[in-house]
């Protein structure tokens, strides 16, 4: 049974639907997380067909709160309908749908009667009014052989790996599994090329990158 509580307004038109809302409560800040539909791409913002992100709230949702400016959360090609819960350790955990509706991809697994997946489960934290995400620490138990390289290329006989790149220069290029990444002047450009099955190019504005962590399996690549 649902009871009506209130209507939450934003100070300007913002799409035609906010799907999959979640109310996230941290000690110092509250957030309304949702997946807006109907936003126009502008200056590399909102490049996906549908977005995901959050409105910081000035106070509790039950009170006369005001929605602050929307912050796009995850810039992946396929991420939607995130759900959140608190685990037995008190952590805020998130998982999302690694897929999108209403889009013409040519995923090769469709011929096998399947497509899409869950994202990695991620711990969500709050710092100075913003949300941060990183894979839960339990994935460390899956680690096996470790390899370290410096100043050279690395060839592996598997597509399933976790990769940490540290001490990144101010600009760099990275080619990995058919995907080209270029970082320059605070802009990360990811080009999926033919490996994208209809996914093309995305841009993420990141003022400074010190390190990068990648999780790869046979059909996906998650970048943090």
Feature roles, as predicted:
Residues 8-16, 71-76:
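Short loop/turn motifs that recur once per blade in beta-propeller domains
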Residues 10-11, 38, 100, 137:
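Short, solvent-exposed coil/turn elements at secondary-structure transition points
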Residues 50-224:
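Beta-rich accessory regions
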Residues 17-20, 78-80:
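Beta-rich catalytic cores
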Residues 1-4, 20-24, 29-42, 91-98, ...:
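Hydrophobic core segments of beta-strands in well-ordered, beta-rich domains
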Residues 12, 22, 118, 122:
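Solvent-exposed, flexible loop/coil residues
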Residues 26-27, 36, 43-61:
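Acidic, glycine-rich loop-and-beta core segments that form the ion-binding/anion-interacting portion
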Residues 11, 21-25, 223:
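Conserved catalytic-core segments centered on acid/base and nucleophilic motifs
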